[in-house]
Amino acid sequence: RTTERTMPMTQNVWEQEAVKDLVQLEEGEFNLCDFALFLSVMKNETAHRNVLSIIMGEKDLELKEVHVEEVILNRSGQRAIRLDARATDISGRNFATEMQNDTEQDDMRRRARFYQGLMDTPVLKSGRETRYKYLPPTIITFITQKDIFGKDLAKYTFTEQCEEIKDLHLEDGTTKIFLNMSSKNGEPVLVSLLQYMKHTTLENPEILVKDERIMQLNEIVTEVKQSEEWEAVRMSILSIGLERGEKIGLEKGLNQGKAQSILELLEESGPVTMKTRKMILDETDAERLSVWLKAAARAGSEADFLSKIC
């Protein structure tokens, strides 16, 4: 049985991701590496299965549950993480697949560690918390645009292993996978999937293998892009982008007004030097401009003003 759980994105997540996706909207095309399209497609069980099948190198992989935007709570019941895409296969393995385009904003290695622990929380809270043997295997995958390890591989797989004894594995059931769209070194079908995600069209010359799973994935992407639900998503992205633009414009207008008021107050005591004028007009911090405005109101001269704000 497949469960498609669609949870509305929190406003701050939409604001962060919509600004990135707005560029794609203006260009008229989304790729599978774009947050909104990735979520919309991964809701589909077949698409989710095909992506995981290629990543894991398991052509016969079968899923029994599929979720997108699932919120995982910590032990105290507080929200901890929101998983982009999560699935469970028929053997009980848990998969979390994250599209992570902006790797410079966070430490992906430590994020994977944090996610790993929290994914076990629902199992431990189910009443069998003292029986750790019930913890299912978990596979966390981060799909990135850049190579965070710098070794030019399309796929990096990490499991716990003893440093003193070669080939002695901890076998704690945890696996962390990092996929890198910038490399062509890896299994041809996986490289083709990553290149398809990066530039989502079968005409992409970087697609080395027209695997049936990629072909099927492309059909689903086409269906999603033609759906009413996707049109609603596009409109939401546009709306949030416009709201953010209006907010930025309003803030910019207020800042310009404050800067002009500061200059007018200073000019009451004499001409303002070009250096000071430029400093005031170039300032974009609203709080700092408010402080300067108060200082200008109390200052008897430009020099007095500068001494108050320095």
Question: Where are the predicted features?
Answer:
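Short, charged alpha-helical interaction segments and adjacent helix-coil junctions
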Residues: 2-32, 36, 55, 88-90, ...
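Accessory alpha/beta interaction modules
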Residues: 2-175, 185, 248, 303-306, ...
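Upstream accessory/linker segments immediately N-terminal to the RecA-like ATPase cores of bacterial MutS
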Residues: 164, 171-187, 192-203
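Pocket-edge structural micro-motifs
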Residues: 142-145, 180-181, 225
